[in-house]
Amino acid sequence: MAIRKEHLEFHPLDLALGWRTPAGYPSGIEEKILAGALDEKAKTGNRTRLLRFEAGARTSLPFVHDYWEEVYLLSGDLIVGDDGKATETYGPNTYACRPPGVHHGPFRSTDGCLLFEIHYYDPGSAGSAWRG
């Protein structure tokens, strides 16, 4: 199965418009979809998005999902593990690549942050389960 995304050449992004709170996220965290579509019910597709945390925004629980995730922190601070367990604080130019099934988070940001994320189901494996 091929990865399907619209062909987009360089174009300006309007960072003031087109943001929405993703399902299951608290207010203060918003996404802007740049390309693709991820269908979590059919376990197909991919998406590229920006995710931003306002200053003080936080999630309350760890995340786990059945698709690959790549995350690059463009600006600001991101604190991982804000659940009474060990925490790590990351700044710009940090990157994570997570296979399906990896627990991560919860997250918070003291000053706010902007993340570039790519999510995708592995088109080469049945059910997209990671076999690593």
Q: What is each stretch, according to the model?
A:
Residues 75-76:
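Glycine-centered positions in the ABC transporter ATPase nucleotide-binding domain
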Residues 82:
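Active-site pocket scaffolds in enzymes
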Residues 31-65, 79, 87, 99-103:
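Conserved short histidine dyad/triad with adjacent acidic residue
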Residues 1-45, 130-132:
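A short, N-terminal "cap"/entry segment at the start of jelly-roll beta-barrel domains
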Residues 100-125:
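Ligand-binding loop in jelly-roll beta-barrel domains
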Residues 71:
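Structured binding elements
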